[in-house]
C-alpha cells in the first residue's frame, strides 16, 4: 500500500518533468539575491521537491490532521524567511502596521512573488472580527499531487497556510492560519486560507483607530 501511494504522489510530477527543461547556469546559491529578483523556479523542480516532502511526511504521520500540522510547520519556516527576503529586495520597503494593509500586501505582492499571480480574493469574516480569508481558486500546491483515497480530505495547501502564518508572525501580526477545501464545479481545487488574528493584533488595531 505504501508503494502504491508513493506512485500516486509521483505520477503527475513525472509528466511535468518530461515536458520541462532542467535549470541551466549557476546554482541559486551562487547568485546575488537582488539579481534574481525576477527569476522563476523551474516548475517541474518545484513539483518534484514538494512531492518528495509530501512522501516524507506521509511516512511519519498516522492521520490527516497530523499530516497537515507537519505541512504547516514546514511552511511556517519558509514564511519567516520570506519576510526577510521580501524586505531585502524591496526598493522602498514599507512596514505595514494595519491589518488590512498587511493582508492586501499578502493577497497581491506576496502571492505574486510566490506563484506569479494575485490571490483570487481577500474577504473578512461576517461572523468573527478577528478572521480573514484569502481565496485561491486554483492553488499550485494541489496541482501536482494525487492524494490516495484514504487521504482524500488532505489539503496540501496546509503548507501555504504555514507560509502565511510564518510571514504574519514575523511581521508582528501573530495569528493562526489553516487551509480549507471549498471546491466549485469550475474550480475543484479551490482553497480558502483562514487567518485568525491574535487578540493583541485586534487590540492594537483599535488603538490605531
Curated annotation (Swiss-Prot):
The keyword Cell inner membrane does not apply. InterPro entries: NO_sig/Golgi_transp_ligand-bd, TRAPP-I_su5, TRAPP_component. Part of the multisubunit TRAPP (transport protein particle) complex composed of bet3, bet5, trs20, trs23, trs31, trs33, trs65, trs85, trs120 and trs130. This is Transport protein particle subunit trs31. It is found in: Golgi apparatus; Endoplasmic reticulum. SUPFAM superfamilies: Ligand-binding domain in the NO signalling and Golgi transport. TRAPP plays a key role in the late stages of endoplasmic reticulum to Golgi traffic. Pfam families: TRAPP (PF04051). CDD domains: TRAPPC5_Trs31 (cd14943). One of its GO terms (biological process) is intra-Golgi vesicle-mediated transport. GO terms for cellular component: cytosol; endoplasmic reticulum; nuclear envelope; nucleus; TRAPPI protein complex; TRAPPII protein complex; TRAPPIII protein complex. Keywords: Endoplasmic reticulum, ER-Golgi transport, Golgi apparatus, Transport. The keyword Transport applies. Belongs to the TRAPP small subunits family. BET3 subfamily. PANTHER family: 41-2 PROTEIN ANTIGEN-RELATED, TRAFFICKING PROTEIN PARTICLE COMPLEX SUBUNIT 5.
Amino acid at each position: 500500500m505504501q508503494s502504491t501511494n508513493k506512485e500516486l504522489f509521483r505520477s503527475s510530477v513525472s509528466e511535468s518533468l518530461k515536458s520541462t527543461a532542467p535549470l541551466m547556469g549557476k546554482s541559486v546559491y551562487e547568485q546575488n539575491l537582488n539579481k534574481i529578483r525576477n527569476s522563476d523556479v523551474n516548475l517541474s523542480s518545484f513539483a518534484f521537491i514538494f512531492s518528495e516532502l509530501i512522501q516524507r511526511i506521509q511516512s511519519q504521520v498516522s492521520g490527516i490532521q497530523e499530516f497537515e500540522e507537519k505541512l504547516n510547520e514546514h511552511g511556517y519556516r519558509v514564511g519567516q524567511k520570506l519576510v526577510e527576503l521580501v524586505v531585502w529586495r524591496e526598493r522602498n520597503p514599507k512596514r505595514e502596521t494595519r491589518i488590512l494593509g498587511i493582508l492586501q500586501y499578502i493577497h497581491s505582492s506576496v502571492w505574486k512573488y510566490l506563484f506569479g499571480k494575485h490571490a483570487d480574493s481577500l474577504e473578512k469574516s461576517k461572523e468573527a472580527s478577528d478572521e480573514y480569508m484569502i481565496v485561491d481558486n486554483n492553488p499550485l500546491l494541489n496541482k501536482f499531487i494525487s492524494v490516495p483515497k484514504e487521504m482524500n480530505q488532505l489539503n496540501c495547501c496546509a503548507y501555504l497556510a504555514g507560509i502565511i502564518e510564518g510571514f504574519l508572525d514575523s511581521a508582528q501580526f501573530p495569528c493562526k492560519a489553516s487551509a480549507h477545501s471549498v471546491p466549485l464545479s469550475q474550480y475543484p481545487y479551490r482553497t480558502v486560507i483562514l487567518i485568525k488574528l491574535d487578540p493583541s493584533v485586534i487590540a492594537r488595531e483599535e488603538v490605531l483607530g
